[in-house]
């Protein structure tokens, strides 16, 4: 099966004054196309750092990243990295990161504005993905008028509007109660199965991780399973 993310010998060291902290140590990982992968481990073990490196939001201190068959040159400009992210990756975060002054429709459109998509096409595509996440009746609402689960649905709609091949989710149910968390997991599974979309999810929830295709565990920056 095709590999869409390949990490080879990834190390990440944070330096503050004279103190060095190794967040990741010699990580070697392949993610297959269409896979739903969970990354688990205690707080501070490097899970989110790993996801940020996969998502080209952070650079490793050493090691190689390959994304959809393309080796990522560490000398790539910020603009080129942003272009790759916008084309290939969708991001879902624990804290939603919605713009509070914009309604649902406008929040979901944002990635297409950065791509230069025309207004009419943006609105059409935004309405399609909003309907898909079950929020057509909330299109004109702002985030403060929505529940936590609804805000996360908006964030997922925004993440998939550009039809990215890979969805990276950092604790997507972490701020939700168990019922809303289960609904978000059901939505993610639907996106995985119906679209063949690759999903990499960081989670503390063992029950939710057990529903995915594969679990990778980290401890102190090292992959242990």
Sequence positions of predicted segments:
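ABC family nucleotide-binding domain
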Residues: 2-219
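Conserved switch/coupling elements of ABC/ABC-like ATPase nucleotide-binding domains
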Residues: 220-225
């Amino acid at each position: 099966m095709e590999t869409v993310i390949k990490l080879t010998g990834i190390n990440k060291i944070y330096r503050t004054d004279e103190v060095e902290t190794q967040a990741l140590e010699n990580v070697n990982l392949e993610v297959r196309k269409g896979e739903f992968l969970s990354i688990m481990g205690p707080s501070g073990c490097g899970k989110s750092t790993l996801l940020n490196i996969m998502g080209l939001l952070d650079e490793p201190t050493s090691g190689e990243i390959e994304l959809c068959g393309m080796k990522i040159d560490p000398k790539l400009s910020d603009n080129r990295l942003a272009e790759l992210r916008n084309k290939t990756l969708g991001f879902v975060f624990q804290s939603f990161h919605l713009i509070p002054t914009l309604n649902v429709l406008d929040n979901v459109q944002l990635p297409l504005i950065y791509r230069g998509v025309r207004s009419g096409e943006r609105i059409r595509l935004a309405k399609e993905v909003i309907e898909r996440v079950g929020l057509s009746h909330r299109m004109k609402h702002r985030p403060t008028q929505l529940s936590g689960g609804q805000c996360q649905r908006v964030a997922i709609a925004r993440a998939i509007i550009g039809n990215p091949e890979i969805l990276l989710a950092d604790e997507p149910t972490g701020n939700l109660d168990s019922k809303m968390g289960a609904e978000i997991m059901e939505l993610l599974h639907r996106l995985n199965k119906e679209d063949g979309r690759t999903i990499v999810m960081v989670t503390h929830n063992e029950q939710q991780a057990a529903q995915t295709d594969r679990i990778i565990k980290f401890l102190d920056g090292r992959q242990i399973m």
